[in-house]
Regions:
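Interfacial segments of alpha-helical transmembrane regions
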Residues: 1-14, 75-83
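Core segments of alpha-helical transmembrane spans in multipass integral membrane proteins
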Residues: 14-18, 22-23, 35-68, 81
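Aromatic-anchored segments of alpha-helical transmembrane domains
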Residues: 16-17, 83-92
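Membrane-embedded alpha-helical segments of multi-pass membrane proteins
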Residues: 59, 100-107
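Alpha-helical transmembrane segments of multipass membrane proteins
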Residues: 65-66, 87-91, 107-111
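Structural signal for the C-terminal ends of transmembrane alpha-helices
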Residues: 69-71, 112-117
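Membrane-interface helix caps and helix-loop-helix hairpins in membrane proteins
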Residues: 91-100
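Short, charged juxtamembrane terminal tails flanking transmembrane helices
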Residues: 119-126
Length: 126
């Protein structure tokens, strides 16, 4: 895998680790409420759901990192597709900006990763 693809996959993994931290530990702070567009009342009512969502974002992050470090190409692709689908769903159910924040980086990482993998496979042996 090329360096650019690795950096992009790591970025997506770190982004989801950040979502875990915000949703599990800082959901009721004014910064996170403003970032996610929720009122203090809604944040108080939805804290357990946000924590659950944060946990799933953590699974995406860990899955991507595990796949990278164990060189599991198909698993990298699987987790990136999961992130893309989650972002598309979020765009329809929450707000369109979710697609930009979540799906676009994963889509860029996936395309770069697949192009990088295809170049590596087609590279002549030395």
């Amino acid at each position: 895998m090329g360096a650019t693809a690795k950096v992009l996959v790591i970025f997506v993994a770190l982004e989801h680790l950040g979502f875990l931290v915000m949703e599990m530990f800082y959901w009721q702070t004014s910064f996170v409420q403003k970032l996610f567009g929720v009122s203090p009342e809604l944040a108080a009512e939805s804290g357990f759901m946000a924590a659950n969502q944060g946990l799933y974002n953590g699974f995406l992050s860990i899955g991507l990192m595990w796949a990278l470090f164990t060189h599991k190409k198909d698993v990298v692709v699987f987790f990136l597709i999961c992130v893309i689908v989650a972002g598309i769903f979020g765009a329809f159910t929450v707000k369109p900006g979710v697609f930009v924040a979540q799906s676009c980086p994963a889509l860029l990482a996936l395309v770069t990763y697949l192009l990088s993998a295809s170049r590596m496979e087609n590279k002549p042996a030395s």
